[in-house]
Every structure is written in structure tokens, then in C-alpha cells.
């Protein structure tokens, strides 16, 4: 990952140059002037981190910071507003978790950092990473998510939490009820911001933001930076530093991508059954575009005596958690899901992704596929493509400057 071409640019202040920057974004490959301020810190030891946090980082198994960590952590710790763009699986969650933990005053049992994420699972995972990295710091951290008991949230928040990670709706609810006090908050992190700032979450984020102290530092982290994000960052950020992986580096290095041509929708199922033995070599995730399709496919696979588990946003929180737990432990090998799973969930053994349906939005492709080769691990992605999907596939190839070939017969050898 160290070879990733990362460029950075200090915040653009004048309106005309900002407009020019947005216009230039339209080009497939964006070149930025590297800002003088962004230097590369090659090791965790040289970042000026507290001793108890360093212990937690090494105990968690990190040895060397990834490209995004080498550039962003120091800037965030300095107190700068940061827009960080980094490919899925490059360690962006740990980037802001380390930065948040470094900036806490553990003696003060009040919420000092707020991290918003688009899904409950991702918020829960961020909480786990914070607790693991902060293992020697006695850090209090709570995941504030919908679908769980409100009373439990209130009790935890009353006890005092240094960091709250959560989904925007529930976090705003807790602020409104005065259970989550915002007076000591120093930092707001928006994770997977491309999804967060999609229409569904935009209003809720603004609602939360209005309650934060005016000097709050804002960090925004995302795999893709569509224009809407860059326009919005103007509203909540002061002279942000941008740390951007060049667009052509968002190709999915180490992940072999294939397609299987299926003439009709019905043929996808037969193709999947033929591939089942290949799927269970390690672990696989199969993506469908709708909850109904997930339920239908799960039932059909089970009728054909294949063992699969499934997850989507309509399932109760408890059920989703137990399915994830089974999948993480390896007890279940094949998970069928909607895009709720594609956002930042880290299951190291997953080395095969199947897009039963191509994603509706090309920016989701990297979130789905980036899942399978995390931290440089190899992975395989197989896209089922009907005749009328060819155009979408070509569009994805062009957007990510990548190549998707027809699946070879020996695909099992590649996993």
C-alpha cells in the first residue's frame, strides 16, 4: 500500500479557485498540487503518540502505518480539519480512531469526540476498534445506534463516554433528549461520508452539527468524493487539508475482477449453484440490490440444500448482530446481503465477492469489492452480467480505470 499515489492539497479559500477545483474534479484523473504541510510519517513511533495508545496499536497487530495513516494522523492530531479520501481496506477507520484517542483527556468523563457512520454495523465496528486500540487507556466508548434499547443508551451516556460512535438519527435523538451533552466535543468525524451525505443522512448530519461547539474540528473520510461532498465540506470546514488518493489509484489492487455473462436473470441462480463449492473455499459475500432479492435468493439456495446466511437492513438489530458474529467466526461461510454490508465491515477471511446484481450506483462498487482484499490481501470479485448490464460494467471499468475480464474455468485456483 505504501506505493499508493497519495496527493494532498491544503484547503482552497477563494470562491473562484474552489469552483475551479470542483470543475477539475470532472476529469477522470485528478492531479493536485501536493500541499507543503502534508508530510509522510513512516512509523507510528514518530507520530508523537502517547505511550498507552502506542501499546494498544501494536497489541492490535498494526506494525507500520498505511499510506493514509502516514499522512492523515499527524494532521488530525494537529487540530486541522481534514478531508481524507482512501480506498476501502486501507486502514481509514484506524486513521481516525488513533487520532481521536490521541486527542482525549481521559480524566474528563465527558464526550469529546463524535463519530457518525451510515450503518449500525459500521458504528459498532468503530466502537470495537476504539476500545481495542484504547485498551491501555481506560477509554469509555459507546455505540449509539437505532434498533437498540433507548434506555440503555441513556444509561451509558449518563455514566459518561469519552467517545460516541453512532448513526445520525439516534445520535441526534440523544442530543435532543439532552442525554448526549455536546459542550466538551472537540472533534466530529464523518466516516463513509459519500454514503452519509447522500440525501438520506444529509439533514440529520446538519441537525447534529448545529448542536456542536463552534470550534469543533471536522474530519471527513470516504472512499469516493462526489461533488456534493466537496460542496458540503465548505459549509462545515475551515481551511481543510485534503489528502486524496488519486482517482486512478482507486483501482482495486490485488483484487482480480471477473464477469460471467448470463443471458437471463433466471440463469444467475444456476451459475451461483455451480460456483458454490468455490465459494466455500474461504468465505464469500453475495450482493443483491434489494432486500426482497436477498430473501428470495436465500430461500432458493436453502431449498437446493446449500448452506447460506443472509442479512439486510429490515432485520432486527439483534438478528443482524448474531448473523455477523457467526460469519466472523467462520461458522457460516456464505453471506447474502444488500449494500448495508458493503460499508466498512472487516471480515479478514472474505476473499470472494459475488455481485449477483451489479450495484445501482458505480460508487458502491468499490465499497463492495474493496471488502475482499483488505490490507493487501488478495481477493476475487465475480460480477453476474445480463446483456443489458454490459453498459454498466463498462462504465464501472472506465470510472475506476480497471479491467474486468471474463471468468476463467479455473477460478477456484485464484482464490
Swiss-Prot record:
In its UniProt record, which GO terms are filed under biological process?
Answer: mRNA splicing, via spliceosome; mRNA transport; nuclear-transcribed mRNA catabolic process, nonsense-mediated decay; regulation of alternative mRNA splicing, via spliceosome; regulation of translation
Report whether Chloroplast shows up as a keyword of the record. Answer: no
- Principal subcellular localization: nucleus
> Pfam families under this entry?
DEAD (PF00270), Helicase_C (PF00271)
- As annotated in the record, motif Q motif runs over 42-70
The record, for InterPro entries, names: DEAD/DEAH_box_helicase_dom (IPR011545), Helicase_ATP-bd (IPR014001), Helicase_C-like (IPR001650), P-loop_NTPase (IPR027417), RNA-helicase_DEAD-box_CS (IPR000629), RNA_helicase_DEAD_Q_motif (IPR014014)
Which SMART domains does this entry report, sorted A to Z? Answer: DEXDc, HELICc
Annotated Helicase ATP-binding domain ranges read 73-243
Q: What does this protein do?
A: ATP-dependent RNA helicase. Involved in pre-mRNA splicing as component of the spliceosome. Core component of the splicing-dependent multiprotein exon junction complex (EJC) deposited at splice junctions on mRNAs. The EJC is a dynamic structure consisting of core proteins and several peripheral nuclear and cytoplasmic associated factors that join the complex only transiently either during EJC assembly or during subsequent mRNA metabolism.
Q: Which family does it belong to?
A: Belongs to the DEAD box helicase family. eIF4A subfamily.
What protein does this entry describe?
Eukaryotic initiation factor 4A-III
This protein's species is: Xenopus tropicalis
User: Quick one: which gene encodes this?
Assistant: eif4a3
Amino acid at each position: 500500500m505504501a506505493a499508493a499515489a497519495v496527493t494532498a492539497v491544503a484547503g482552497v479559500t477563494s470562491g473562484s479557485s474552489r469552483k475551479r477545483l470542483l470543475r477539475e474534479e470532472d476529469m477522470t484523473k485528478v492531479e493536485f498540487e501536493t500541499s507543503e504541510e502534508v508530510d509522510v510519517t513512516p512509523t507510528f513511533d514518530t507520530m508523537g503518540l502517547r505511550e498507552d495508545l502506542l501499546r494498544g496499536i501494536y497489541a492490535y497487530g498494526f506494525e507500520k502505518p498505511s499510506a493514509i495513516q502516514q499522512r492523515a494522523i499527524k494532521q488530525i492530531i494537529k487540530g486541522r480539519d481534514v478531508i481524507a479520501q482512501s480506498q476501502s481496506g486501507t486502514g481509514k477507520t484506524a486513521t481516525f480512531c488513533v487520532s481521536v484517542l490521541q486527542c482525549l483527556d481521559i480524566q474528563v468523563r465527558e464526550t469529546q469526540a463524535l463519530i457518525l457512520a451510515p450503518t449500525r454495523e459500521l458504528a459498532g465496528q468503530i466502537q470495537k476498534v476504539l476500545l481495542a486500540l484504547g485498551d491501555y487507556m481506560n477509554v469509555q466508548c459507546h455505540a449509539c445506534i437505532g434498533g437498540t434499547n433507548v434506555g440503555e443508551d441513556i444509561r451509558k451516556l449518563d455514566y459518561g463516554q469519552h467517545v460516541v460512535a453512532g448513526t445520525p438519527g439516534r445520535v441526534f435523538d440523544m442530543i435532543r433528549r439532552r442525554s448526549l451533552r455536546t459542550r466538551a466535543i472537540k472533534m466530529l468525524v464523518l466516516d463513509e461520508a459519500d454514503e452519509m451525505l447522500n440525501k438520506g443522512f444529509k439533514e440529520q448530519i446538519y441537525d447534529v452539527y448545529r448542536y456542536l461547539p463552534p470550534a469543533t474540528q471536522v474530519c471527513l473520510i470516504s472512499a469516493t468524493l462526489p461533488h456534493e461532498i466537496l460542496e458540503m465540506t465548505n459549509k462545515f470546514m475551515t481551511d481543510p487539508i485534503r489528502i486524496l488518493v488519486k482517482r486512478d489509484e482507486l483501482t482495486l489492487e490485488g483484487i482480480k475482477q471477473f464477469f460471467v455473462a448470463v443471458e437471463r436473470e433466471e440463469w444467475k441462480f444456476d451459475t451461483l449453484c455451480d460456483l458454490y463449492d468455490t465459494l466455500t473455499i474461504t468465505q464469500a459475500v453475495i450482493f443483491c440490490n434489494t432486500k426482497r432479492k436477498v430473501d428470495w435468493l436465500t430461500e432458493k439456495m436453502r431449498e437446493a440444500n446449500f448452506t447460506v446466511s443472509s442479512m439486510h437492513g429490515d432485520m432486527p438489530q439483534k438478528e443482524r448482530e448474531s448473523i455477523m458474529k457467526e460469519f466472523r467466526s467462520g461458522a457460516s461461510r456464505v453471506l447474502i446481503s444488500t449494500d448495508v454490508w458493503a460499508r466498512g465491515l472487516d471480515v479478514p477471511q472474505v476473499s470472494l465477492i459475488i455481485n449477483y446484481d451489479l450495484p445501482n450506483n458505480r460508487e458502491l462498487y468499490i465499497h463492495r469489492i474493496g471488502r475482499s482484499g483488505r490490507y493487501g490481501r488478495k481477493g476475487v470479485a465475480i460480477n453476474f452480467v445480463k446483456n443489458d448490464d454490459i453498459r454498466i460494467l463498462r462504465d464501472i471499468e472506465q470510472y475506476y480505470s480497471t479491467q474486468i475480464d471474463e471468468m476463467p474455468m479455473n477460478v477456484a485456483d485464484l482464490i
